[in-house]
Every structure is written in C-alpha cells, then in structure tokens.
C-alpha cells in the first residue's frame, strides 16, 4: 500500500476467567498466563505468581485507520450480558418516526451487577484501585477508603455513547437519533452472522473520531454543540465508554479522546496512543527472559 500507516490497528481488550462464568460457551475464549495474588488480606492483594487460565472476552476497543483521519476511528464492543443500561431513547423505524424510551434495565444476573436497586447511586462505586494514597501506581490491588476488595455493581450510564437529551454530533439532532443508528447497525450485522455464532453475543456500543480528522482536543461535541464543530471536537457517539475498561470514567464530558489527546492538540503517536510510552526494547526483554532462566 502507498501509505505505510494504512490498515494500522490498535486493540485493547478485557477478560475474565472463563471458569468463573456459568456459560463460558457464550464467550470468545483464549488461553493465557495471568498473575495470581495473595488474597488473605481484604485491604491489599499482592502478586504472588502466575498461572495458566482460559480467559473469556468481555470487552474490546478496536482503533482503526481510515483515510483522512490520522486520529483514527475508535470503536468499542461489549458482551451483551455485562451490565444493565440506564434509560435511553431511540427513533422507531415506522413512518411516524416516533421517539421511544427504553426504561433502565432491572433485575439481577448481569456479569457486573447483581442488585435490584434502581438508584444510579447504587452503581459504579469502585471498591478497589492500583494506586496508593500518594498517587503512585503499583502492581498491588488496594481497597478504596471505607471498602474491602470486593465486587461492586456497574451500569452503562451512557448507552450507545450518548447522554440523555444531549446531541452527540452535528448530524444527529438528538441522542435518540444517534442511538437509533447504533442499534440499527447491531441489528443488521447480527442478522448476517450465521446460526449460533458466539459473535452474536457482542454488541457494538459506538465509535468516535474528530471533526474533519483534526488533532483531538478531548472536547466532546455535546460540550459545545455548534455547527460546524470546532477543530479537534469529538464526534460520532461522542461520550463513548466501555463499562469494563472505563467503568468509573463514564461521564457526559468524557470520551476516549479525553485521555488520548494532548495540549496543544497533536497527531504525535505518543499523544494519541498510550502504547508508545510503554514500549520496551527487544534486547531488554531478551535480557529479562535470560535472567528468569538462570
């Protein structure tokens, strides 16, 4: 291809141990080596080794290259059983184009929620972190103040990457219009996947990019809904979040570009992607492997 960046792709995914699921056959699975922890203290878990395990895919970001969009297109997908949705609206497919409201999901049995409480305050309260009180990141899992290391209930508060009553881009007049497009894509693609293919169990939540492919500023369209949008404004489903990776970062003011951007706005690889700052020379990896063998 004439462009060396054509077809470039970046993937970030989230997994759980398949052995913890009642229906692992409904998930994409892989075998992996994962860290193990000493869990005797409910305030801090420390790594104590590794093990082989079958892992089940629960969420995935796919960042793909598109002509004239050097910021790339950021899409995210989730397993349909992850979390309940907050209420949202869509436009039905009848001639009347009626706006319909889907009430907040209720009930138990979700992978990351098991409460009958319908108050939004019952959800998305983190019980653990990897950061110390001084702000230093560690390999430990640490209980947040007043909690033990334990499960908490999660909700998708911004279904389909839009905020209730707020426009998400310059072409859709409402969140209902934007939601309808994402729901329609899911219905159409699922209709083309044959039989009991497990890919039917995953939902496209949405995708974002910037207006005219300009360097991202991190500002979402809903924060300044003008037409045309300002340079670097996030459009598409502009408050996109994945409940398995941005669990506690769901906000009508946030999207992928909130973190994957710089000031001043730039297309520099390290400004858009977090991978480049974490790259390690191969000779260093080689030396580490040799030390382990000894």
Which ranges hold each PLM region?
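Sequence context surrounding c-type heme c attachment/ligation sites in exported
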Residues: 8, 18, 23-28, 55-61, ...
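A short linear-motif detector with a strong N-terminal bias
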Residues: 39, 51-52, 236
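Amphipathic interfacial helices
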Residues: 45-46, 50-52, 68
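A domain-level signal for the mature, folded cores of soluble proteins
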Residues: 1-48
């Amino acid at each position: 291809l004439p462009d060396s960046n054509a077809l470039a792709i970046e993937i970030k995914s989230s997994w759980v141990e398949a052995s913890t699921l009642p229906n692992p056959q409904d998930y994409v699975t892989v075998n992996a080596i994962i860290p193990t922890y000493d869990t005797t203290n409910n305030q801090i878990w420390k790594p104590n080794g590794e093990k082989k395990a079958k892992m089940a895919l629960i969420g995935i970001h796919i960042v793909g290259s598109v002509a004239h969009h050097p910021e790339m297109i950021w899409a995210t997908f989730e397993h349909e059983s992850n979390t309940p949705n907050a209420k949202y609206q869509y436009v039905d497919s009848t001639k009347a184009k009626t706006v319909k409201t889907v009430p907040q999901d209720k009930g138990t049995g979700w992978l990351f929620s098991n409460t009958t409480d319908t108050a939004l305050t019952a959800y998305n309260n983190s019980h653990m972190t990897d950061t110390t009180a001084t702000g230093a990141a560690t390999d430990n899992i640490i209980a947040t103040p007043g909690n033990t290391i334990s499960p908490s209930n999660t909700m998708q508060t911004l279904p389909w990457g839009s905020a209730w009553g707020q426009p998400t881009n310059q072409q859709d007049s409402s969140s209902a219009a934007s939601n309808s497009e994402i729901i329609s894509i899911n219905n159409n693609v699922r209709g083309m996947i044959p039989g009991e293919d497990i890919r039917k169990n995953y939902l496209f939540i949405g995708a974002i990019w910037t207006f005219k492919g300009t360097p991202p500023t991190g500002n979402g369209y809903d924060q300044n809904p003008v037409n045309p949008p300002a340079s670097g404004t996030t459009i598409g489903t502009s408050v996109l979040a994945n409940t398995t990776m941005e669990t506690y970062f769901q906000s009508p003011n946030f999207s992928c570009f909130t973190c994957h951007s710089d000031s001043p706005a730039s297309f520099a690889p390290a400004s858009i992607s977090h991978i480049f700052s974490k790259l390690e020379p191969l000779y260093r990896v080689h030396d580490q492997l040799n030390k382990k063998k000894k």
